[in-house]
């Protein structure tokens, strides 16, 4: 869990920006989106193979 302590004389906008950056670096939102809905194993395999195909194709 990302935590951000608001320092003295720091604006809320700056603290929010630091919080958003820490959340994106930790990968919390990506993990949430990945687990939001159940994916059958066959669908996971299909998506994984499509991603590999995209990486190979310049």
Curated annotation (Swiss-Prot):
Disulfide bonds: none annotated. Pfam families: Ribosomal_S21. GO terms for biological process: translation. PROSITE patterns: RIBOSOMAL_S21. Keywords: Ribonucleoprotein, Ribosomal protein. One of its GO terms (molecular function) is structural constituent of ribosome. GO terms for cellular component: ribonucleoprotein complex; ribosome. Belongs to the bacterial ribosomal protein bS21 family. This is Small ribosomal subunit protein bS21.
